[in-house]
From Swiss-Prot:
Keyword NADP applies: yes
Species for this entry: Carboxydothermus hydrogenoformans (strain ATCC BAA-161 / DSM 6008 / Z-2901)
This enzyme's EC code(s): 1.1.1.25
Gene: aroE
Protein family according to the UniProt entry: Belongs to the shikimate dehydrogenase family.
Name of the protein in its database record: Shikimate dehydrogenase (NADP(+))
Pfam families: SDH_C, Shikimate_DH, Shikimate_dh_N
Annotated function: Involved in the biosynthesis of the chorismate, which leads to the biosynthesis of aromatic amino acids. Catalyzes the reversible NADPH linked reduction of 3-dehydroshikimate (DHSA) to yield shikimate (SA).
Active-site annotation: 71 (proton acceptor)
Length: 280
């Protein structure tokens, strides 16, 4: 990879970034297309976030990804936010265009592309969304726009109600459930999506309180976590014969869309898959 005065800079801002796979995914794609671009991990403490975002203009970055915990916090520092990102309430991709920083959300369409890749149809289907935080918002928006009937389960009912209120004009949210000690039956649903940190470090031995009784091979278990590749939730689902998808697929497709926005060209998807350990 060549780096010179004409190299266009991209990257990811978040905290922490120790386990991010995005740099290797994007840099391998740049290399494959012989593009003079570089993708950097930019670990930024919260008190330095304003300077970091404004610095994108100073250092003439072409764009960046935004990850936890800043997807909602970057809004005040942007010149423009795309309508979809405003509705979702989160920005995960920023494009620097002629001195203006424009915020987008590629998580939602990336999630839908991951469903398409895995031949999962959600139109008219009942989907259980586990969680109502920042990660859940993009998934909820994606599912609702695809015509799914959404049921939201969260430990804090008020937060689930807030999400439902924000998206009441987007699609059908038919029920809000309390995610507590009493397990929620998965049997009535076509798919369940875990957006909670239960299953990732340091909660590897935990999963949402759900009951797998009645789950069949038609059921789809989706976990946004990709490290570990198989969470306790996915493992239990697989043991019941269900189809399972981890977060690598969404990571890939949101990255594909961000890549296109920065470069104006379609990335080599197979190269990106290989870079993050996804089978082609």
């Amino acid at each position: 990879m060549r780096i010179n005065g004409e190299t266009k800079l991209t990257g990811i801002i978040g905290y922490p970034l120790k386990h991010t796979l995005s740099p290797q995914m994007h840099n391998e794609a740049f290399k494959a297309l012989n593009l003079n671009f570089l993708y950097l991990p930019l670990e930024v403490a919260e008190e330095s976030l304003p300077q970091a975002i404004y610095g994108l203009k100073a250092f003439n970055f072409r764009g960046i990804n935004v990850t936890i915990p800043y997807k909602e916090k970057v809004f005040p520092f942007l010149d423009e936010v795309a309508t979809e990102a405003k509705t979702i309430g989160a920005v995960n991709t920023i494009v620097h265009d002629r001195g203006r920083l424009i915020g987008y959300n590629t998580d939602a369409p990336g999630f839908l592309l991951s469903l398409k890749e895995n031949d999962v149809e959600v139109t008219g289907k009942k989907v259980l969304l586990l969680g109502a935080g920042g990660a859940a918002r993009a998934v909820a928006y994606a599912l609702l726009t695809a015509g799914a009937e959404l049921i939201i389960a969260n430990r804090t009912i008020d937060k689930a109600k807030e999400l439902a209120k924000d998206f009441q004009g987007v699609g059908k949210i038919s029920e809000i459930l309390e995610l507590g000690d009493k397990p929620i039956s998965l049997a009535p649903y076509h798919m369940a999506v875990n957006t909670l940190p239960l299953g990732m470090h340091p909660y590897e031995n935990q999963m949402p309180a759900v009951d797998f009784t009645g789950v069949t091979s038609d059921f789809v278990a989706y976990d946004l976590i990709y490290n570990p590749a198989e969470t306790k939730f996915l493992k239990a689902s697989k043991e019941k014969g269900a189809r399972t998808i981890n977060g690598l697929s969404m990571l890939l497709w949101q990255g594909v869309l961000a890549f296109e926005k920065w470069t104006g060209v379609s990335p080599p998807v197979k190269v990106m898959k290989k870079a993050i350990g996804l089978s082609c």
